[in-house]
């Protein structure tokens, strides 16, 4: 009995074709007869052959990995960078992004390499990694409006796709949501419930998504005769939602409906309202944004504006794959539509 790994020759014998044909199928070369491809794939399954990724990369000139970069604009202190990484892993939104990307890449035998770019040194490391060809391109989730990484990647002409429209215009592809429409959906639902004193907990207002959600919310309320909407800015965390809701109650103690710009902050809003003896939704209706797992486990379960994060992330990966295959195309922008999901909080 031999422990030797199956080779291309073994697959060729099993399939009854030449070694060159097997190589073309394994390396994804086009214009191979579909019937021959099926024969080869069946032979691969029977023999247990595993393609050598290094050898395949020599043929395809692709690393078959992509850099998944979570970037910000913080300082270089160890404490700041550790906190940045911890926040990313604690946010269910990021987990959904990873799930969508992996769901696209895995069937294509491609893999993400997770990188964090909070400091200038981190950003330089990302640029070097890509310039060396160790990844085919970058999928960037930026967490700060002042993040310089998108502009650096565009200037270096490195294949890149962003999750969400950047705060500053750069010639890069991105996927995003119609956040303004999402804000309108939240406002219209609160009004339909009979809320007459609505307020909002926004995300960081230096981010385009936060500003757009607020604009849509305000527009819908203004059309219904509510020109002034009390607001408090949060930071997309439970604690920031608690603090923002406390400020709102100090400004508008008779508030009867709250739109929080993500589910984590909505959870914080619900917690603070309970502490103040306010019932949700009987006294104050609460709407979140994202439809993350938090929306289903919150007490009460959150009515929320669904953002199809997994689909958006998969499209992000598809755009990058297409960009690499075509060896450069003009920027593509894909906009997804939000959807209101009604549960118990509003």
What is the role of each PLM region?
Residues 46-52, 119-123, 270:
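Short gly/ser/thr-rich secondary-structure transition/capping motifs
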Residues 1-2, 10, 14, 46, ...:
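Bacterial carbohydrate/catabolite-sensing allosteric modules
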Residues 1-3, 65-188, 250:
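Alpha-helical recognition/docking segments in bacterial nutrient-uptake
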Residues 29, 61, 76, 122, ...:
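Generic structural signal for helix capping and beta-alpha/helix-loop junctions
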Residues 1-65, 69, 346:
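N-terminal helix-turn-helix DNA-binding module of bacterial transcription factors
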């Amino acid at each position: 009995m031999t422990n030797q790994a199956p080779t291309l020759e073994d697959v060729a014998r099993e399939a009854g074709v030449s070694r060159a044909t097997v190589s073309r199928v394994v390396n994804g070369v086009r214009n191979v007869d579909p019937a021959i491809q099926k024969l080869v794939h069946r032979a691969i399954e029977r023999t247990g052959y595993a393609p050598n990724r290094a050898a395949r990369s020599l043929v395809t000139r692709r690393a078959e990995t992509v850099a998944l970069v979570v970037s910000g604009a913080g300082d270089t202190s160890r404490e700041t960078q550790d906190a940045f990484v911890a926040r990313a892993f604690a946010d269910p939104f990021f987990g959904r992004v990873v799930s969508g990307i992996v769901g696209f890449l895995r069937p294509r035998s491609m893999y993400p390499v997770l990188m964090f770019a909070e400091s200038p040194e981190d950003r330089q490391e990302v640029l070097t990694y890509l310039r060396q060809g160790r990844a085919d391109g970058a999928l960037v989730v930026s967490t700060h409006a002042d993040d310089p990484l998108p502009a650096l990647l565009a200037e270096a002409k490195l294949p890149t796709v962003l999750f969400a429209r950047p705060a500053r215009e750069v010639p890069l592809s991105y996927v995003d949501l119609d956040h303004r429409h999402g804000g309108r959906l939240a406002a219209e639902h609160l009004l339909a419930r009979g809320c007459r004193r609505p307020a909002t907990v926004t995300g960081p207002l230096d981010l385009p998504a936060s500003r757009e959600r607020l604009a849509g919310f305000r527009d819908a309320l203004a059309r219904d005769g509510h020109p002034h909407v009390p607001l408090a800015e949060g930071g997309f965390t439970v604690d920031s939602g608690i603090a923002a809701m406390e400020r709102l109650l100090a400004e508008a103690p008779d508030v009867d409906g709250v739109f929080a710009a993500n589910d984590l902050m909505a959870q914080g809003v619900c917690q603070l309202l309970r502490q103040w003896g306010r019932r949700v939704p009987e006294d104050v209706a609460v709407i979140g944004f994202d439809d993350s797992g938090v929306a289903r486990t919150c007490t009460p379960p959150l009515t929320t504006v669904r953002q199809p994060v997994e689909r958006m992330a998969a499209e992000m990966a598809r755009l990058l794959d297409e960009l690499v295959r075509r060896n450069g195309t003009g920027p593509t922008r894909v906009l997804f539509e939000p959807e209101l999901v009604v549960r118990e909080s509003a």
